[in-house]
Amino acid sequence: MESLKQKILSEGIVLSDQVLKVDAFLNHQIDPALMQQIGHEFAQRFAGQGITKIVTIEASGIAPAVMAGLELGIPVIFARKFQSLTLKDDLLISKVFSFTKQTESTIAISARHLTAADKVLVIDDFLANGHAAKALIDLIQQAGAQVAGIGIVIEKSFQEGRNLLESEGYRVESLARVAALENGQVRFLD
C-alpha cells in the first residue's frame, strides 16, 4: 500500500535494526485518513470471504481493525491485555509475548462475543515473530470459530512471523512489508 509506505518513510523512526517507531500515525497519534485507507484495503483484500467478525489486540490494532470493520460492515472485538471489573466471566484466555516491550501478557475476550459460527479476520498493527497473531488465533480456536485470514499493517519480513503463520496454513496479508531496518533507513520488500 503505497500511501502507508510513504507515511512510514516520512514519519517512521528507525530505533534499531529490529524496531520501527510509528507513533506519529499508528500507535500513539492516529492518522484517521490513513486508517480509513487501511480499512478499505483490508476490506478489499478479504472481500467475499464470509467474514463475520474482526479480532485484534489492544491498543494499537484497534484503529485499523475498526476501520476494516466499518468497511466490511461487521463487529470488531479487541482482546484486552488485562482483566477489568467488567471482563471477568466466561473468558477465552491466552498469553502473548510482546517483542517491543519484551514482556508476556495475558489477553482475554468474552466468550459471548465469539461463537463457532464465526469466521474471523485477525488484524494487528505489526507482525514480527507472530506471537500476538498466534495468541489471537488461540482465542478464536477456543471459541470453535474459524480463522479466515490475518491482516497486518506493517510486517517485519526479516523476522519469522509470516513463515510461522503460513506454515500453519493461515493466509497473511500485509500492507507494508519491511525487508530491513538498517542505518536508520527502512527498506521495503516489495
From Swiss-Prot:
Q: What does the sequence similarity comment in the record state about its family?
A: Belongs to the purine/pyrimidine phosphoribosyltransferase family. Xpt subfamily.
**Catalytic activities:** XMP + diphosphate = xanthine + 5-phospho-alpha-D-ribose 1-diphosphate
Q: Which residues bind xanthine?
A: 20, 27, 156
Enzyme Commission number(s) of this protein: 2.4.2.22
The UniProt entry lists the main location of this chain as: cytoplasm
Molecular functions (GO terms): xanthine phosphoribosyltransferase activity
Its BP terms in the Gene Ontology are: purine ribonucleoside salvage; xanthine metabolic process; XMP salvage
Question: Mind telling me which InterPro entries this protein's record contains?
Answer: PRibTrfase_dom (IPR000836), PRTase-like (IPR029057), Pur/Pyrimidine_PRTase (IPR050118), Xanthine_PRibTrfase (IPR010079)
Family annotation (SUPFAM superfamilies):
PRTase-like
- The domain of life for this entry's organism is Bacteria
Function according to Swiss-Prot or TrEMBL? Converts the preformed base xanthine, a product of nucleic acid breakdown, to xanthosine 5'-monophosphate (XMP), so it can be reused for RNA or DNA synthesis.
Q: What is this protein called?
A: Xanthine phosphoribosyltransferase
Q: Where in the cell is it found?
A: Cytoplasm
